């Protein structure tokens, strides 16, 4: 009696492994970029949460930094997320201001890798900063103090080229 063998040959299995390897070579870097972009977007959400505090600061006449000072009414002008920390800086933003006190927006500095999940931040953005300038209408635009690579900056705040 002859027995028939069934199954895949070695060459067929090697071809499948090679195809999977080629697909992985393209997919893994794209996935890492996707993760970094999604983590960078959290910073803008943190900055959005600071808009009320910025408005309170401007009612008091100036942008106030992150240090809490109950005597002046400053209550910790920062917000910590999972992947980063957003801080209102002492710098006002108004390119048309003629004198101090004419500010209509503050600057927010987001530092990635200073959140509650420091060890889970993508190495592509860890330690990078995104500076946001608040405009008159309350929206944000990218500031000059940004060292976050352009491909990770959310489109909503990206500086027009």
Swiss-Prot record:
Pfam family, one: N_methyl
PROSITE patterns, sorted: PROKAR_NTER_METHYL
Cysteine pairs bridged by disulfides in the record: 63-106
Residue numbers carrying N-methylphenylalanine: 8
One GO cellular component term: membrane
Main location: other
Topology term for the membrane: Single-pass membrane protein
DNA-binding is among the record's keywords: no
GO biological process, one term: cell adhesion
Protein task: Major component of the type IV fimbriae that plays an essential role in twitching motility, natural transformation, and protease secretion.
Assembly, per entry: The pili are polar flexible filaments of about 5.4 nanometers diameter and 2.5 micrometers average length; they consist of only a single polypeptide chain arranged in a helical configuration of five subunits per turn in the assembled pilus.
Protein's recorded name: Type IV major fimbrial protein FimA
UniProt source species: Dichelobacter nodosus
């Amino acid at each position: 009696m002859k027995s028939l063998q069934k199954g895949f040959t070695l060459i067929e299995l090697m071809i499948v492994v090679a195809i999977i390897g080629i697909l992985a070579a393209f997919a893994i870097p794209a996935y890492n970029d996707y993760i970094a972009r999604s983590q960078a977007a959290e910073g803008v959400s943190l900055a959005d949460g600071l808009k009320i505090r910025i408005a309170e600061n401007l009612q008091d006449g100036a942008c106030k930094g992150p240090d809490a000072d109950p005597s002046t009414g400053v209550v910790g002008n920062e917000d910590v997320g999972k992947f980063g920390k957003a801080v209102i800086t002492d710098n006002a933003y108004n390119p048309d201001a003629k004198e101090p006190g004419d500010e209509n927006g503050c600057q927010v500095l987001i530092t990635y890798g200073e959140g509650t999940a420091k060890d889970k931040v993508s190495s592509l953005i860890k330690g990078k900063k995104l500076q946001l300038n608040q405009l008159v209408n309350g929206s944000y635009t990218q500031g000059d103090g940004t060292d976050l690579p352009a491909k990770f900056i959310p489109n909503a705040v990206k500086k027009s080229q």
